[in-house]
Amino acid sequence: MSGAVLMALTLTIGCIGVNTATVQAAEYGVAPATAVLYTGSGAEVFAQPDPATLVTVLPGDVPLQVTGMTSNGYFQVVVNDGIFYVYGKALSAAVGTNAYKLTSIDAKAALVGDAATGQLIYAQNAYDRLAPASTTKIMTVLLVMDAIAQGKIALDTPVMVSSTALAGIPSDASHVSPRLKAGEVMNVLELLECVMLSSDCHACNVLAELVAGSVDNFIAMMNARAAALGCTETNFVNTSGYPDPNHYTNAYSLFLITKEAYHYPVFQVIAAMPAAVIPATNMAPERSLETTNALMKASEYYNPYAIGVKTGSAQSSGLCLVGAAKKNDTTVITVVLGAGNNLMSDGTRLKQQFSETNKLIEMGLAGK
């Protein structure tokens, strides 16, 4: 590193000592790494792997000695014998790159990670316990995918809606029209479309009874599957995410669940559906379904790279979205929990689960 760059950093950083910027092990893991990488123009240097601790901004093509990589997507670098952090996409193995300026996401928690490798590109409060609302349904669908893979059921398996599946679910949790009725027969694929596109809670319970014999048995399976995936701060008490103080998870656990679900091609297809038509049943006329994900249909939030997956909203959870996007051979998974619905100066409302997800997609697919 040149003397001029060292001097500039010394003046900017001042008296920050070697031990001031230490990683908080409870929040961030650090994998050892050794490399010399170059900054892109506008690379930001942080005291900790957290965008709130900005120290300075570097010009392009500054060589930095890397000593590690944090679990939330930062390089650990040495500057003036001190440890600092630079966002991963701000460094490159070659000169002449453009750094991606890191911006915080306006939500209680957010992340974006690689769906293939599991590497997090950006994370913000990713391990905080929060209400997931209907993003819970990804776990419900994952267990249905498991049952299909095990040969226990098939997409064309007919299912009769029981009165017990409908019992105890408030009317505002039914989102298909007309609502499912006891005695109505649909197949597994149609019920999955009701869950993923229209976020129907009754359909979740119908599938739960099919897979596990009862809703309670299915909920136990949900929690066991979450534990096996390494989910933390996670406890499911229903199949749909309907608000309950004992129903919670975190952004990273939703990332793990969604990453697992994406191993199933059928899940990928259903998650990417912008719309579907449910044929007439023995008790209802044809139903038309449309995704609740504004990134996947004509809207101000439309993103051509978006391929899924599930929205969620409740007063207790705020606005939530677990998303996925693909560009060339790269697929990323995004999670936004606790976003707002902000009133803008022109009287419109900014639905931040969508606007913030678009920021995450831009981060995750930069340079791909």
Mark where each language-model region is.
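SH3/SH3-like beta-barrel fold
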Residues: 61, 75-79, 334
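Active-site-adjacent loops and short helices of periplasmic peptidoglycan-processing enzymes
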Residues: 96-252, 262
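Bacterial N-terminal signal peptides that target proteins for export
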Residues: 1-5
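C-terminal segment of classical bacterial N-terminal signal peptides
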Residues: 11-22
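Penicillin-recognizing serine hydrolase domain
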Residues: 103-109, 213-368
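Solvent-exposed coil/turn segments that connect beta secondary-structure elements
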Residues: 42, 50, 69-71, 80-82, ...
